[in-house]
Amino acid sequence: MKTFHIATAAVLAIAAVSPHAVAQSSQSSFGSSSRDSQSAAPSTSKSAKPKEPQLNVRDVYSCPTPDKVQRQAEWKVYNTSGLALTVYVADDAGNAYQVLERVGTPAKRAWAPKLQDGTYHLTCVFHNDSAVKSDDFTVTGSTITEAPKMVPITDREVAAVAIQQAAEQKKRVPELQKKAHALADATSKNRPTARAAYLDYLETYRSFDDSSEMWPGPDLEGYAEVEKLLWSKRPVKDAAKPARALADAVDKTARALETSHFAIPAPDYGLRTHEVMEEFERFDMRGERDFGAHALPTALRGNVTSTRLTLDAVRSLVEGRGLDTAPIYDQLDELDKIAGEFDEKYDTAFDKWSQKDRMRLQSAVARANELLAPVATMTVIRRMD
């Protein structure tokens, strides 16, 4: 039975967050095992391990119910629903246990969740669609006595966080307007002044979460053209027109936000806490957002601010479920430090940096994304109420 509608993100990361939090999921993709390819000759051993049951997810209207589990669950999840899938184990008290995430379609994955004796059900969470509950199944004879678990965060709780974050972000829009107009004014001056104003704008723009792309009002991507012109051999005044257009777009967006409401959709909120840094790793560090300024440290500072502000709003919620956020904030501080250090050291593209410094930044960003991953998971595994 379909129980409630959510628009969950397809890309989730899972990690063990505390002795009381959700246990780490099976991360390995399914592949044919040797026992699957053995001949059909009858076995002479009575203790031969049976083939894992297959849980078939055929559509978005039902979630398969496992047979009774003796000792240890070992399943193969086969998703042919047409949508990416996340599956987790839950009990009637509302606790979530273990998660199998990022099951594509069609795709087959092995899953061996560690569960103690008890009664459970599965919840299938479909990308941009529904969460569907299976019937109950039981586990008996398990050697596990304290399976890690988490009381799921509710939709109402996440929605409140999204509204709070949106209100705080809205207060900062006038700052973006100010920086945009300062940039437009600077294009009538010398190149160093105009470039400095651009970098100031860029850092402020990057300090907003990436859902700003969905704000009401015009597109705010015009900064790329300004950057190309200011770091070219063309006269500074050539950047005046796109800079004025950018300032006008920011003004129109500010007015639109005054008369309408926008907040990160609740099902996506946890993902947004680390999507900014993931996209920095995926795009900025590959040079795809370098339009001539070689301003990677500036972009990093803005992204760190964005991540902090998005995490601040949900911090008490995830800490209440057992997540220690102190290491996350420490790592963001480390990234800020690295950004300042490399801003002084480099004015070249990232691929021209020394290998040692590239690896240092790559490692620090990857660590931040690793630490942020449980926030996404904890806000998508939600009680169905």
Model-identified regions with their sequence ranges:
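Gram-negative bacterial Sec-dependent N-terminal signal peptides
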Residues: 2-19
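Boundary at the C-terminal end of the N-terminal hydrophobic targeting segment
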Residues: 21-25
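Extracellular/periplasmic metallocenter environments
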Residues: 32-38, 42-58, 103-148
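Structural beta-strand segments of beta-rich domains
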Residues: 53, 71-75
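Short beta-strand segments of immunoglobulin-like
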Residues: 60-68
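Asparagine-centered strand-capping/turn motif at beta-strand->loop junctions
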Residues: 77-81
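Surface-exposed loop/edge segments in extracytoplasmic proteins
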Residues: 84-86, 94-101, 327
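Mature extracytoplasmic or organellar-lumen-exposed domains after removal of signal/transit peptides
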Residues: 142-385
